[in-house]
């Protein structure tokens, strides 16, 4: 049975609950099958595992721990967040390159994690999509932050875009910050590369097609209203058997997750509640 919940969240908390009391995460490394050394952080002592995958040009510490997301999850779950290859403290065989989906599977194998919740932001969401295609049986739930899956059909893409066009766009400082971010990402990417969330793991061979209608994995998407949310989620809404679409009013690709600072409590609350609702 399809369950769809569209959530518009309006309250803003300045600090996540328990943010200041969070202990330092554990820091470790493992070596991927191609010899690349991958850094990862862990938190929490009990409960099901949650795997967190950060975005392009970021790190596990900044995106998940500094924001308060990982500490909130670690109250009732075990959390692991990797620095994608080419990022953070992991090896950088391709400077300014993207992450690799197989690194996530190999990290789970290294830690003997049979199944886990998974959540990725931006590029991390692209990697999450690949993981659902490669090994859906390994995941309890899947989360797309600042991301989703675009429609392959041109007519369906246009329909989703028309829905986004009805939403207001960012203005002033928010719009200027997004322009600076796009310019920084464009300058960092190799020539000819597309957006990181659409090319999350070029080193992953033979990724099978993803047919969400054949999966039973509950899926959540969390996007700002200024971040073209319907273009990212229309396919998820059509195909996923269980899908929750969370749209944060007045948030951009940058402010929806507040990288490097306290996280908007709305994102944390939606993510934690969803994971707990389908934990098994």
Regions found by a protein language model. Give the residues of each.
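Catalytic active-site module of serine/aspartate enzymes centered on a nucleophile-bearing elbow/loop
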Residues: 249-280
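Conserved loop-alpha-helix segment in the C-terminal half of the alpha/beta-hydrolase fold
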Residues: 71, 225-251
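Short beta-strand/loop motif that positions the catalytic acidic residue
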Residues: 215, 221-223
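Active-site nucleophile elbow and catalytic-triad environment of alpha/beta-hydrolase enzymes
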Residues: 184-211, 225-229
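Conserved HGGG/HGGXW glycine-rich cap/lid loop of the alpha/beta-hydrolase fold
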Residues: 36-89
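Flexible "cap/lid" loop of the alpha/beta hydrolase fold
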Residues: 129-134, 142-170
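Active-site loop/oxyanion-hole signature of alpha/beta-hydrolase fold enzymes
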Residues: 81-116
